C-alpha cells in the first residue's frame, strides 16, 4: 500500500490528486475516529493522524478530515488566539492557498476571500 501511494504521489500531478484526496481521506478518517488527537481547524478528534513525508514519514502528521499538517494547525491556533483574523470579515488575497484553510476562510470571509494559484483546481484565480 505504501508503495502504491508513493508511486501515485511521484507520478500523478498534484492538481489531479487535489480533486480526489478530500473524499478518500475523509473515508479513511471515518475509520480513524477517536479521542487521542484533535484537529483545531475542524474540531474533530481521531485516534491517530496519518503519516506524512516522502523520505522519512512523520507519524501522526496529516489530519484526514481537514488535510492539515502540523504547521497548518499551529498557524490556525496562532491566528485564532493572537490575532483578530476571525473576529471580523477581511478582504484578502490568499496566494498558493493551503487546502485545509480554504473552506474555513471562505466561510468566515465570504466573497472577500480570494484564493489564487497557478495550478490548483481549487483556487478561484
Task: List each model region and its residues.
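Conserved N-terminal segment of class I S-adenosyl-L-methionine
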Residues: 2-125
Amino acid at each position: 500500500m505504501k508503495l502504491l501511494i508513493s508511486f501515485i504521489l511521484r507520478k500523478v500531478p498534484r492538481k489531479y490528486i487535489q480533486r480526489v484526496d478530500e473524499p478518500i481521506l475523509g473515508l479513511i478518517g471515518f475509520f480513524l475516529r477517536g479521542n487521542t488527537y484533535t484537529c483545531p481547524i475542524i474540531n474533530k478528534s481521531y485516534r491517530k493522524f496519518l503519516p506524512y513525508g516522502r523520505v522519512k514519514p512523520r507519524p501522526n502528521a496529516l489530519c484526514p478530515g481537514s488535510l492539515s499538517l502540523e504547521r497548518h494547525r499551529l498557524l490556525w491556533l496562532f491566528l485564532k488566539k493572537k490575532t483578530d483574523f476571525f473576529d471580523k470579515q477581511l478582504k484578502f488575497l490568499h496566494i498558493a492557498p493551503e487546502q485545509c484553510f480554504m473552506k474555513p476562510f471562505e466561510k468566515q470571509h465570504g466573497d472577500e476571500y480570494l484564493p489564487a494559484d497557478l495550478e490548483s483546481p481549487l483556487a478561484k484565480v
